[in-house]
Amino acid sequence: LIWSMMIFLFVGVLSLSIYSQLAPKIMPNADNGINEPLSMTESINKLESYLIENPEDFQALKMLGLAQVGTGNVEKSIESFEKAFLINPNDIDLLLQYASAIAANQDGKFYGKSKILIEKALSLDPQSIQVLYFAGIVAAHQTDLDQARGYWQKAIYLMTEGHPDRNIIEQALDTILNLQVK
């Protein structure tokens, strides 16, 4: 027992000394090139300033919309996404983000313009797992559970076994299957 304790302590001390030698040395310096990350509000302000000079920058408009959603300013995000949409109406990611922002303003329901945006995304990329997921949500909101099931089954078919979103879509599929049984 004593020998095992001594070996344990020796290995622990040895490990700490090796790790301390491997750790990067940071010299105390006021200007070491490491900046604090910007807050979401600061990021939004920088993007808005940048867009004054570059109003046609699609990626900046899309990032601004995402940041505005992140701060809960859905109305402003819809405006930013609309500007980005006018520049590039065929960007799948934008279509999904834009539709989601509009749906957030509609109590989470995908109808009207948000539905049209999802349908456009589906026509552009009917093999996209994200698009199929959203198309299933649209169908479920319209109480077309068979169509929702079809979209989600196709999405699961296209996914690898370890895909991070697989569980979410399987749960959605289970929910509508339970609704159809009742």
Predicted ranges, named:
Residues 1, 6-12, 149-182:
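Terminal, low-structured helical/coil segments at or just beyond the last alpha-helical repeat
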